[in-house]
């Protein structure tokens, strides 16, 4: 696993998602009203995956690999109904497909060698669960004992290497983002493969689009690092190529497919893009040097470390792991735990970013929208929550 995608698994732990009393700060280059402080729907443990189904029902995943249905009640606290689990050390992505099928996506991280948590609750007649395979799309249906493997994303990427890879790992795979389509197929954003894949209802995989690297400048304010920690870093302002790192995918209100980028090292703030891809596309290229041509065109720019996308009637929403960047979080820089949530609205001939819940989210992991309600999960490690914004 390369350095950038490893950061998605090892982002620093924090203890709360809502920051009490923190004054909103102006976000440079971003405009629009800030929504009210998020409301806690229910406490969760290191949540990430979220699929808001409407009528107060939301699918979520947590750090132990479990997936549950959160049911909001008019009078009383929300109820969390466990549905199943994958033995993994990072919460999978989740999406509800047709006929009650739940899709779950594991990344490059798989189950821990020794699952002390599971072993501690096993009885003499029980068998410790096998670690879930990494880089795999699973599906689960009501009545099934456990999720079943459906598509081996990692194996597919071995035969479909990234031609623009910058880290000598062209066959690397870390599927991270997931969206279920109405025809029974599934879209998968592979962070290490820098591409968007489509898995059809039979489990066959095709490459929808490849996201090419972008030349960025090394940001100011990075500390000096010793060689054993990856240093020395290039001087600020040095232009270097940086991989896209496709983390997220959603279907927009216009039916188009939208893909979000984390941005590889040095994770320069403001260089993450959102791409718009025409439905049914195969073999497209998302090229920052020619962003307005072909079947993949740039929809938004100026974001930082995007980890999830969602769509509603008002447009596409982008969730940032950190407004300073994932690399700043990895370095432990002050304030780097603060994430961002933006509604990407149309503005003249382009788009405009409207921030929601300004400075109220810490290392968030997932976002989804139903009606006018925006649901956010996080932080990725430690005590967290499912939140509702709007």
Predicted features and spans:
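Blade-edge beta-strand/turn elements of extracellular beta-propeller
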Residues: 32-42, 75-87, 143-169, 202-242, ...
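A short loop-to-beta-strand structural motif that recurs across blades of beta-propeller domains
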Residues: 66-69, 133-138, 195-198, 207, ...
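Beta-propeller domains
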Residues: 59-80
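Secretory targeting and sorting signals
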Residues: 1-28
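Beta-rich, blade/repeat-based domains predominating
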Residues: 41-57, 86-101, 106-108, 157-186, ...
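Asp-box/WD-like beta-propeller blade repeats and closely related beta-sheet repeat scaffolds
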Residues: 87-93, 109-175
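Residue-level signature of beta-propeller blades and closely related beta-rich strand-turn architectures
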Residues: 64, 108-110, 192, 263, ...
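Short, conserved, GDST-rich strand-edge loop motifs in beta-rich repeat architectures
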Residues: 104-134, 219-220, 258-273, 319-338, ...
């Amino acid at each position: 696993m390369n350095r950038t995608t490893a950061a998605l698994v090892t982002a620093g732990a924090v203890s709360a998602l809502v920051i009490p009393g923190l004054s909103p700060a102006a976000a440079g280059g971003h405009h629009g009203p800030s929504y009210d402080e998020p409301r806690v729907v229910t406490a969760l443990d290191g949540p990430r995956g979220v699929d808001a189904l409407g009528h107060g029902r939301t699918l979520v995943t947590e750090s132990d690999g479990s997936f549950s249905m959160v049911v909001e009640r008019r009078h009383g606290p929300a109820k969390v109904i466990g549905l199943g689990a994958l033995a993994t050390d990072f919460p999978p992505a989740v999406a509800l497909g047709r006929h009650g099928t739940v899709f779950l996506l594991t990344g490059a991280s798989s189950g821990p060698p020794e699952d002390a948590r599971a072993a501690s609750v096993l009885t003499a007649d029980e068998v410790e669960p096998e670690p879930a395979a990494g880089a795999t799309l699973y599906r689960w249906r009501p009545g099934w004992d456990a999720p079943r493997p459906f598509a081996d994303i990692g194996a597919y990427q071995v035969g479909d290497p990234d031609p623009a890879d910058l880290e000598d790992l062209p066959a690397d795979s870390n599927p991270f983002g997931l969206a279920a389509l109405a025809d029974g197929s599934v879209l998968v954003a592979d962070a290490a493969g820098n591409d968007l894949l489509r898995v059809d209802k039979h489990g066959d995989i095709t490459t929808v689009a490849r996201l090419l690297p972008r030349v960025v400048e090394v940001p100011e304010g990075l500390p000096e690092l010793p060689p054993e920690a990856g240093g020395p870093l290039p001087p600020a302002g040095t232009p270097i190529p940086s991989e896209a790192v496709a983390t997220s995918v959603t279907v927009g209100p216009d039916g188009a497919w939208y893909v979000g980028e984390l941005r590889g090292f040095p994770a320069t703030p403001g260089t993450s893009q959102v791409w718009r891809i025409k439905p049914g596309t195969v073999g497209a290229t998302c090229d920052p040097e020619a962003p307005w041509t072909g079947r993949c065109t740039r929809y938004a720019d100026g974001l930082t470390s995007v980890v999830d996308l969602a769509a509603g009637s008002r447009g596409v929403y982008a969730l940032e792991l950190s407004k300073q960047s994932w690399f700043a979080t990895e370095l432990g820089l002050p304030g780097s735990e603060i994430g961002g949530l933006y509604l990407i609205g149309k503005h003249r001939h382009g788009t405009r970013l409207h921030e929601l819940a300004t400075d109220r989210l810490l290392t968030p992991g997932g976002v989804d929208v139903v009606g006018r309600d925006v649901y956010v999960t996080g932080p990725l490690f430690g005590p967290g929550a499912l939140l509702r914004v709007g």
